[in-house]
């Protein structure tokens, strides 16, 4: 909580919480409670909170209606695309995996979250599909053709 306060005092305009997918790997009450405690502490700073990934945690918290008024949005990477980290290439997400994420994003939208997508290196056809899907659902998206997101383009 001290770090959240210090960051707020520095003038940040919101929090982007990464690695909430730890709950996917360790689906135990202690991890869930830890994430909820962290979110409640950060929320005290009255800044928007966006969670990156963490679909298993978010889905569980939605079932418990635990995030209303606390979390503003979610960012999901690689819904339509996927990354092969062994050779740093991009591909198309298998349809069954994509369907899972499309259902998840629909839950998030229905719950009231602002939804963000980040996709990597799609073909022109997949890029058109991503744009059409996001525009029809009111989602904010970015498409990167590089894994080096820290570099200006």
Protein language model features and the residues they cover:
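Glycan-processing catalytic domains of CAZymes
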Residues: 1-153
């Amino acid at each position: 909580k001290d770090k959240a306060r210090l960051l707020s005092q520095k003038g940040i305009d919101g929090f982007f919480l990464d690695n909430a997918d730890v709950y996917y790997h360790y689906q135990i009450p202690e991890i869930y409670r830890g994430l909820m405690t962290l979110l409640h502490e950060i929320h005290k700073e009255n800044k928007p909170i966006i969670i990156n990934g963490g679909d298993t945690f978010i889905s569980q918290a939605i079932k418990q209606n635990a995030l209303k008024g606390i979390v503003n949005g979610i960012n999901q990477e690689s819904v339509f695309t996927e990354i092969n980290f062994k050779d740093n290439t991009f591909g198309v997400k298998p349809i069954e995996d994509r369907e899972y994420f499309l259902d998840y994003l629909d839950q998030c939208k229905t719950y009231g979250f602002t939804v963000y997508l980040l996709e990597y290196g799609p073909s022109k056809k997949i890029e058109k599909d991503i744009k059409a899907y996001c525009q029809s659902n009111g989602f904010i998206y970015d498409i990167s053709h590089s894994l080096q997101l820290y570099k200006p383009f």
